[in-house]
Amino acid sequence: MVAMAAGPSGCLVPAFGLRLLLATVLQAVSAFGAEFSSEACRELGFSSNLLCSSCDLLGQFNLLQLDPDCRGCCQEEAQFETKKLYAGAILEVCGUKLGRFPQVQAFVRSDKPKLFRGLQIKYVRGSDPVLKLLDDNGNIAEELSILKWNTDSVEEFLSEKLERI
């Protein structure tokens, strides 16, 4: 059985064609320097903490066709980063998976989150630990996987990025 979906002309086309169309559109958008949303990057198979230096390595593995998507999803390494405070942050975790990340669990269940203005703990089913930094309008400015961070790293990072109470 082949999955079918309505195409642009109303005709039924294989769902694979829609994925190909989506990939083509995303490549066209990336050619104009636009960044993809974190959801689109995950759909394309890229991590939320992908560094642009990783995209430079694609040629070594004959994967240059992935370069435009990689560039649309990557984050530049901060060479001369100025200290920027964000308006808030959301630490997303799955309550049922939290035990697999004892360091993040220790941070979430401690009093430390109360020390940071604008920090919210959000339980999202199935989510690995992710930290979303918010701009002044409440939009996601940065998204980082904190999968392997320890309690001190989370606290230190938040001390640099959020205002302490």
From Swiss-Prot:
Keyword Lipid biosynthesis (UniProt): no
Protein name (record): Selenoprotein F
Lineage of the species this protein comes from: Eukaryota, Metazoa, Chordata, Craniata, Vertebrata
Subcellular location: Endoplasmic reticulum lumen
Gene Ontology biological-process entries: 'de novo' post-translational protein folding; sperm DNA condensation
Domain of life according to the entry: Eukaryota
Function per UniProt: May be involved in redox reactions associated with the formation of disulfide bonds. May contribute to the quality control of protein folding in the endoplasmic reticulum. May regulate protein folding by enhancing the catalytic activity of UGGT1/UGCGL1 and UGGT2/UGCGL2.
Pfam families: Sep15_SelM
Subunit structure: Forms a tight complex with UGGT1/UGCGL1. Interacts with UGGT2/UGCGL2. Interacts with RDH11.
Principal location listed in the UniProt entry: endoplasmic reticulum
Cited InterPro entries: Sep15/SelM_sf (IPR038219), Sep15_SelM (IPR039992), Sep15_SelM_dom (IPR014912), Thioredoxin-like_sf (IPR036249)
GO molecular function: oxidoreductase activity; selenium binding; thioredoxin peroxidase activity
Alphabetic keyword roster: Endoplasmic reticulum, Selenocysteine, Signal
Membership in a protein family: Belongs to the selenoprotein M/F family.
UniProt key word Signal: yes
Tissue expression notes: Higher levels in prostate and thyroid gland.
GO cellular component terms, semicolon-separated: endoplasmic reticulum lumen
Stretch forming the signal peptide: 1-31
Post-translation changes: The N-terminus is blocked.
